[in-house]
UniProtKB/Swiss-Prot annotation:
Organism listed in the record: Rickettsia peacockii (strain Rustic)
Keyword annotations from UniProtKB, A to Z: Cytoplasm, Methyltransferase, S-adenosyl-L-methionine, Transferase, tRNA processing
Lineage start: Bacteria, Pseudomonadati, Pseudomonadota, Alphaproteobacteria, Rickettsiales
Listed GO biological process terms: tRNA N1-guanine methylation
Enzyme Commission code(s) on record: 2.1.1.228
Name of the protein this chain belongs to: tRNA (guanine-N(1)-)-methyltransferase
Catalytic reaction list: guanosine(37) in tRNA + S-adenosyl-L-methionine = N(1)-methylguanosine(37) in tRNA + S-adenosyl-L-homocysteine + H(+)
Protein's job: Specifically methylates guanosine-37 in various tRNAs.
Amino acid sequence: MSILHATILTVFPEMFPGTLGHSLAGQALNKNIWSYDVINIRDFGLTKHKNIDDEAYGGGNGLIMRPDVLGSSIDHALALNPNAEMYYPSPRGRVFTQSFAKEMLKNKNLIFLCGRYEGIDERVIEEYNVKEISVGDYILSGGEMPTLTILDCLIRLLPGVLMNQNTLSSESFEEDGEFKGGLECSLYTRPEIWRDRAVPSVLLSGNHRLINEWKKEQSHMITKLRRPELLKDL
């Protein structure tokens, strides 16, 4: 079985593995279920100052990461991780979803290009057929945090990461799961009563048919209230 390998291009290599070195992702890293390497883009910078950016043609605010610098760093990444699919976290990209995550895992070799400043030269995207990917309709300081988020999602889908792989079927957004792509139902644990708030009695009944019906009803109600667009295919 091939493992997931991610090559990460960044100007802040110390940010990795970051949170991915802990909890489930960290355990999976130690078990060699996934691996990574980091390339410091600044190592390919120009002049003694290792410049990696410049002013934008046509004017505008902010600096743009240079294509010659990025090209050299990407060529190095492809030498380390040939046949990899390359992703660039960007607000212009296709929105990352659970189904998109499964699609990404069809290729276990991935390269993440973490942008900074105003972004990267468009010619880099064209030259390397880079796929732009967005984690939401908001702006961050760079591509490192989205890359960590995307990798965390991918890693927990890998066999051997979760103690019980069936857990995935009862989570939000799982199209083939218990809630058919909707949001997960409300969850409860001990104590049975906390600050005068009781666990719904049906969950204590032991009647699995009624419990399953309650969970599906809860999921539908919560999805309709908070994410009604998810119901279109239900």
